[in-house]
Amino acid sequence: MSLDVDGALERVLSGGDEWRAWRALRLGGDDAGAMPRIPGQDRVGGFAGPTGRPSPGATGLALCHLELISAAGAPAAIIAADWLEAMRTPAHAWLDAPDDVPGVIDDRGAGRVWATAATTCALLAARRDPGPRAFALLRGEVDQEGHVTGGTYPTFALAGAAWLAEGPGTETAEWALRWTREWAEEWWGPQERATALTFWAAAGIPPEHPSVDEFLEELRSEAPQEGWTDLDLTLLALELVAHFD
């Protein structure tokens, strides 16, 4: 990894907010104290998506991130999981507006698939039950290559959800993970790889899996020595490397 870990942590501590500083101190092995309030989370547990509205997909991703940094037992994680359970639709799925789906979407149903995949992965990682209908819905959205209706980000989340729902090495999980290796899009960058790795870390996919190994190596090679101008991306990359190493 070309990233200077100590230098990047110092940048976060000097330029980041309280939440980033808390994470940086923990990564550096220092006493970080109590977890501060997480930016973007409302008082009932939901996290804001790209539009600023509370989003099941964004909340699922945030809950997976808390699992990644070993904070799944924190109050912020507990109320996020509670909020997700409360947001289940009558069809036992979850729903986001298309504008709240990250990346390039390829289907009008992307909001439903993204929200359901991210939430299913997060709830299973948090030892909660998303219900059998949620994963049955997701399985019906997977094509013969392993791609999921809605695009890249729903496929990343589905891979983690399938690993947890069906077990390691099962067909749905491996199809989705293979798709991420064999059908990579030109527009994918460090943000896409870091997001995928967050879902996969929460799901417990091991570092030796070919998809994890490839994405982690690409993330390492893309990192500037001083880190990205996006402090959140820099900090997340450091957390992912620490987790998988």
Locate the predicted segments by residue:
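Preference for long, amphipathic alpha-helical scaffolds in soluble/luminal domains
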Residues: 1-245
